[in-house]
Amino acid sequence: MAELGLNEHHQNEVINYMRFARSKRGLRLKTVDSCFQDLKESRLVEDTFTIDEVSEVLNGLQAVVHSEVESELINTAYTNVLLLRQLFAQAEKWYLKLQTDISELENRELLEQVAEFEKAEITSSNKKPILDVTKPKLAPLNEGGTAELLNKEILRLQEENEKLKSRLKTIEIQATNALDEKSKLEKALQDLQLDQGNQKDFIKAQDLSNLENTVAALKSEFQKTLNDKTENQKSLEENLATAKHDLLRVQEQLHMAEKELEKKFQQTAAYRNMKEILTKKNDQIKDLRKRLAQYEPED
């Protein structure tokens, strides 16, 4: 790390920008100097001037210098915005979110540090040449947090990519060997079939037709049997349902007949006589029990 706390690559980028800014600053200073020189050559030709003439000359010079300085300041601000845009665009390609601290731009200590760095860069006689002329990509700015995780993930993916390449190469070799072996086996099989062609006949078309007819007949018979069983099952289910209904109807008729028989029996003379006799017998039994109770000794 150098004086600004940056690595060599970023320090070279800072030096390039400082050279660019110094060049633009020099051009603007020359423009301001030319304003004064033009004033001297065009207006200061008399030996004496009145107060109004001096005031007019100074006002004109002030307007020109003000315009030049304002133009330079505006251009510098726009240039800084373009520089930040480049950095942010590169950071977004790495899915990074950079942050800036505006208050640090007015830190006198840091500004003096930059000034000393510029002086050292100007006076240094052994500056390293900047060989990298290609457009760089912004690397992670710190070694922790999201940037560190992203860097580790990139390294892991690179290692995995190398492993996959090696594995793919191995698989390609195995596939090539397998294809060669397959070709050899196919050729051997063709040779064997040609050798057996004169010794053994294959299935004839007629045999195949007979086999198809037999299969069709078996299918038809099976379907017929299946249909018969289905019809028999349906018939049995219908008969069972009919029998259940008949059984319920007979049970209901039997129950009604029993009720009717009991009702008719209760209406007969024999039933009434028997009921009357039973009533009398019960009364006699009650009377006898009362009499017996009178003769039983008391405890």
Curated annotation (Swiss-Prot):
UniProt GO BP: flagellated sperm motility; negative regulation of protein localization to ciliary membrane; negative regulation of protein localization to cilium; spermatogenesis
InterPro entries: LZTFL1
Keywords: Bardet-Biedl syndrome, Ciliopathy, Coiled coil, Cytoplasm, Disease variant, Obesity
GO CC annotation: cilium; cytoplasm; cytosol; manchette
Residue ranges of the region described as Interaction with BSS9: 145-299
Coiled-coil portions: 96-296
Disorder association: Bardet-Biedl syndrome 17: A syndrome characterized by usually severe pigmentary retinopathy, early-onset obesity, polydactyly, hypogenitalism, renal malformation and intellectual disability. Secondary features include diabetes mellitus, hypertension and congenital heart disease. Bardet-Biedl syndrome inheritance is autosomal recessive, but three mutated alleles (two at one locus, and a third at a second locus) may be required for clinical manifestation of some forms of the disease.
Family as reported in the entry's similarity comment: Belongs to the LZTFL1 family.
General function of this protein: Regulates ciliary localization of the BBSome complex. Together with the BBSome complex, controls SMO ciliary trafficking and contributes to the sonic hedgehog (SHH) pathway regulation. May play a role in neurite outgrowth. May have tumor suppressor function.
Name recorded for this polypeptide: Leucine zipper transcription factor-like protein 1
Organism for this UniProt entry: Homo sapiens (Human)
Gene label: LZTFL1
